[in-house]
UniProtKB/Swiss-Prot annotation:
Key words, A-Z: Adaptive immunity, Cell membrane, Disulfide bond, Glycoprotein, Immunity, Immunoglobulin domain, Membrane, Receptor, Signal, T cell receptor
Glycosylation-annotated residues: 32, 44
Main location class: membrane
Pfam families: V-set
Gene: TRAV41
Protein name stated in the entry: T cell receptor alpha variable 41
Residue ranges constituting the Ig-like domain according to the UniProt record: 24-112
Record localization: Cell membrane
Length: 112
């Protein structure tokens, strides 16, 4: 009986998470971006409801989705990529320094 109860609680939690996520409006800008090699690029993401984490994802043409960053506060850096989040302002940015043709991809901001 205990195992069944834990399973049901997990299902309920997943359902509540989906409902909460459905009410959160996420806006990413710019929606399209063209840059010259070597430029500094910024992609912004705003959301309407408090979150536990924000993910920056990348998908190259014909490829799978890759997680770049998971943020709950502050700033993270990996190579030429920098991601920041401001929980109070409900805003995150992804910065690409010294852009390169291999950076051509779809960038996705996802919240939970």
């Amino acid at each position: 009986m205990v195992k069944i109860r834990q399973f049901l609680l997990a299902i309920l939690w997943l359902q509540l998470s989906c409902v909460s996520a459905a009410k959160n409006e996420v806006e990413q800008s710019p929606q399209n971006l063209t840059a010259q090699e070597g430029e500094f690029i910024t992609i912004n993401c705003s959301y309407s409801v408090g979150i536990s984490a924000l993910h920056w994802l990348q998908q190259h043409p014909g490829g799978g989705i890759v997680s770049l960053f998971m943020l709950s506060s502050g700033k993270k850096k990996h190579g030429r990529l920098i991601a920041t989040i401001n929980i109070q302002e409900k805003h995150s940015s992804l910065h690409i320094t010294a852009s390169h043709p291999r950076d051509s991809a779809v960038y996705i901001c996802a919240v939970r």
